[in-house]
A protein has these predicted regions:
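Conserved small/polar residues in nucleotide/adenosyl-binding loops
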Residues: 1-5
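Short catalytic-site patches enriched in acidic/histidine residues
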Residues: 14-56
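Catalytic core of Fe(II)/2-oxoglutarate
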Residues: 8-9, 35, 50-107
Length: 107
């Protein structure tokens, strides 16, 4: 992405509020009985920070519609682009469609 004006986003965030919402998905230890952990979706916000996303289950959808495992190393931070950032960047940054699948090994 090439944004020439380094202050491009300033007017969008000036006097804005901020929300930090921590979410923890604990390991599944029992048979999920057809439960869906998180169906395919894009996040509505600017970005989603995924700390500790080094376990299996998170998948992102590529431009061909295929699902790819998204696994970070333990010392890495994964960042999902949200719908708002996609819109504000005129879709130069794409909102990440992702899901969380339940793996048989998890329980």
């Amino acid at each position: 992405m090439c944004i020439r004006d380094r202050n491009y986003f300033d007017n969008y965030i000036k006097n804005g509020n901020s929300i930090l919402r921590p979410i923890h998905y604990p390991p599944i230890t029992e048979d999920p009985k057809e439960a869906v952990r998180a169906a395919a979706h894009g996040d509505i916000n600017l970005i989603t920070l995924l700390m500790g996303a080094h376990g299996k289950g998170l998948q992102v959808q590529n431009t061909n519609g295929d699902w790819i495992d998204a696994i970070a190393n333990k010392d890495e931070l994964m960042i999902n682009i949200g719908d708002m950032l996609s819109r504000h960047s005129n879709n130069l940054l794409k909102s990440t469609v992702h899901r969380v699948v339940i793996l048989i090994k998890n329980y």
